[in-house]
C-alpha cells in the first residue's frame, strides 16, 4: 500500500476539515495515489473516492443528567468536597448578596415613604454592622421600631397636652387670685372710707 499522506493533507485543505476526518477509498488506492494536486483531489471528491467523515458525536446527555442531579443536591456529600466551605461558597459573596437584599428593601421603603430619612440612615448603618440576619429580621425590626416610635410620640403628645392643661389651669387660678385680691382690696378701701367718714 502506497503512502497517501500528501493526498490526505491536500484533501483536508480542500474539504476544510482535519486530516482525521478525511476518508480515502481503500479500493481505489492506485487512482488516489496518482492525484498530487488540489485540482485532482477536487475531482476525486466529486467522484466520491474521497469523503469528509461526519463529526464524531460526543454526547452531553450524561453530563446534563449529572448536573441536574447536582442541582437537586445529589453528589455533594463530604466525599465529593475538595475545597474549604469558604472556597466553595465565599463568605464575601454571601455578605454582598445579603447587603444588596437589605439595602434594596430599605431603599424601597424609603421611596414609598414608609421610613423617614433618619430611621432609614439608622437602619442602613445597623445593616452594615451585621445587625440583621435576613430580610424577615429587618422587616420585624422596622415594624417594632415604628410601633415604639408611634407609642413614644403618643406619650409625648399626652405629656404635652397635660402640661398645656396644667399651664392653662395655673393661669386661670392666678387670674382668679388677682381678681379676688383686687376685690378684697376694694372692699377694704371701702370699709376704711366708711370708718373715716364716721
Curated annotation (Swiss-Prot):
GO cellular component, one term: cytosolic large ribosomal subunit
Pfam families, sorted: Ribosomal_L19e, Ribosomal_L19e_C
Annotated segments matching region Disordered: 66-85, 150-177
Keywords from the UniProt entry: Ribonucleoprotein, Ribosomal protein
SUPFAM superfamilies: Ribosomal protein L19 (L19e) (SSF48140)
Molecular function via GO: RNA binding; structural constituent of ribosome
InterPro entries: 60S_ribosomal_eL19_sf (IPR035970), Ribosomal_eL19 (IPR039547), Ribosomal_eL19_CS (IPR023638), Ribosomal_eL19_dom (IPR000196), Ribosomal_eL19_dom1 (IPR015972), Ribosomal_eL19_euk (IPR033935)
Keyword Ribosomal protein: yes
GO biological process entries: determination of adult lifespan; translation
UniProt superkingdom: Eukaryota
UniProt similarity note: Belongs to the eukaryotic ribosomal protein eL19 family.
Protein name: Large ribosomal subunit protein eL19
Amino acid at each position: 500500500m502506497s503512502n497517501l499522506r500528501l493526498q490526505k493533507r491536500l484533501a483536508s485543505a480542500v474539504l476544510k476539515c482535519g486530516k482525521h476526518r478525511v476518508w480515502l477509498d481503500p479500493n481505489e488506492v492506485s487512482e488516489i495515489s496518482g492525484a498530487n494536486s488540489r485540482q485532482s483531489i477536487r475531482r476525486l471528491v466529486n467522484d466520491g473516492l474521497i469523503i469528509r467523515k461526519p463529526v464524531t458525536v460526543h454526547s452531553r446527555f450524561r453530563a446534563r443528567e449529572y448536573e441536574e442531579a447536582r442541582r437537586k443536591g445529589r453528589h455533594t456529600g463530604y466525599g465529593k468536597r475538595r475545597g474549604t466551605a469558604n472556597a466553595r461558597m465565599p463568605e464575601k459573596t454571601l455578605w454582598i448578596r445579603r447587603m444588596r437584599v437589605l439595602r434594596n428593601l430599605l431603599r424601597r421603603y424609603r421611596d414609598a415613604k414608609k421610613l423617614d430619612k433618619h430611621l432609614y440612615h439608622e437602619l442602613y448603618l445597623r445593616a452594615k454592622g451585621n445587625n440583621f440576619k435576613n430580610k424577615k429580621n429587618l422587616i420585624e425590626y422596622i415594624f417594632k421600631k415604628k410601633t415604639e416610635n408611634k407609642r413614644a410620640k403618643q406619650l409625648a403628645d399626652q405629656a404635652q397636652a397635660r402640661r398645656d392643661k396644667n399651664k392653662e389651669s395655673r393661669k386661670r387660678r392666678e387670674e382668679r387670685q388677682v381678681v379676688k385680691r383686687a376685690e378684697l382690696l376694694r372692699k377694704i378701701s371701702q370699709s376704711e372710707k366708711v370708718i373715716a367718714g364716721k
